[in-house]
A protein has these predicted regions:
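Extended, regular secondary-structure scaffolds
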Residues: 1-24
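Switch/communication elements of ASCE P-loop NTPase nucleotide-binding domains
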Residues: 1-8, 124-210
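ABC ATPase nucleotide-binding domain
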Residues: 29
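Extended helical coiled-coil dimerization/tether regions that scaffold
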Residues: 12-17, 26, 39-145, 149-156, ...
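A short beta-strand-to-loop transition that corresponds to the Sensor-1 phosphate-sensing loop
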Residues: 36-38, 64, 197-200
């Protein structure tokens, strides 16, 4: 709410070294995306808000619906399909998705799936082939594919992405590939991310300015 509440927030940036503070302007971030796949987290995601005229947009990527209700596999698959269609509806997004998949293919299992071939299809044929692919994936690979596809579909300039402990559901090689794909996407879109993590793999993959 500190970021998405239009005209109501008293949130500020703090410079801990200089003891200075600066209010966060209503339009500082264009959108906020929160990513959390913990089924036991007490966090209840707000309703998605995709309309920029109402303030900062908000998108949620995770397992929860409303309250304590969790999404089923069909919900997750449908969410992926809708995001994929959004990615393929615009050439720049399509190219960013293909670049992200290319980075993820440093993971051998991802490389063997032939995901980039989906870009050759559209309409019902795309839906059928994409649904078949995600149904055969392990939970970790499905989570990464859903997450990166939705991020490509939603991240715009000055988007803030919040990610909660990605290592909790991803093996190290896949986690490493995901963080690299995320970094490349955010660099391309001039976005930023805050990641809550205990993983040295995540820290290892975070880009460092010279």
């Amino acid at each position: 709410e500190a970021i998405t509440s239009k005209g109501q927030s008293t949130a500020k940036f703090y410079d801990v070294e200089g003891w200075q503070e600066e209010p966060i302007a209503n339009d500082y971030f264009s959108s906020l995306v929160s990513v959390s796949f913990s089924a036991f987290d007490p966090f209840e995601p707000p309703r998605e808000q995709p309309d920029p005229s109402l303030g900062t947009c908000y998108f949620y990527i995770g397992l929860k619906k409303e309250g304590d209700t969790l999404k089923g596999l069909n919900d997750i698959h449908q969410e992926f399909l809708e995001a994929l269609k959004s990615c393929f509806s615009q050439l720049p997004r399509r190219d960013r998705w293909l670049k992200a998949i290319d980075t993820l293919e440093s993971d051998e299992n991802f490389a063997s799936m032939g995901l980039k071939g989906l870009a050759e299809f559209s309409g019902e044929e795309l839906t059928t082939k994409a649904r078949k692919m995600i149904k055969t994936m392990s939970s970790g690979h499905a989570v990464v594919l859903l997450t990166i596809t939705r991020l490509v579909a939603t991240v715009e300039e000055k988007t803030l992405v919040l990610i909660d402990e990605p290592e909790s559901h991803l093996p190290p090689p896949l986690l490493s590939a995901f963080i690299r794909a995320l970094s490349e996407l955010l660099y391309d879109r001039n976005g930023v991310s805050i990641i809550a993590t205990h993983s040295p793999v995540v820290l290892q993959e975070i880009p460092r300015s010279s």
